[in-house]
């Protein structure tokens, strides 16, 4: 199973890439929204972990684009967010995100469980 991780926090990306790889996932990590949109289309991930705040686009703008594209509209998206962005998370869920994670207060194992649940593996 392939996970696309779209996040500009290098330390967090390293931690989650290692944890997901250890669990048998293939991880494609990018740090801008446009790279994420491009990789979602070309890499055909099984799931996307999407940060809400990126240097070039908001997570919700990326989610909108993903849901409009035939190639990516059915890929489950889990939002990575901070507590200060709860309204954005609610908006993302309304736009089709399957779940959310408050990224700085969660263990990788909890994210892996959410991924497995979203992929129907639990």
What do these predicted ranges mean?
Residues 32-35, 58-64:
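Acidic catalytic/metal-coordinating carboxylates
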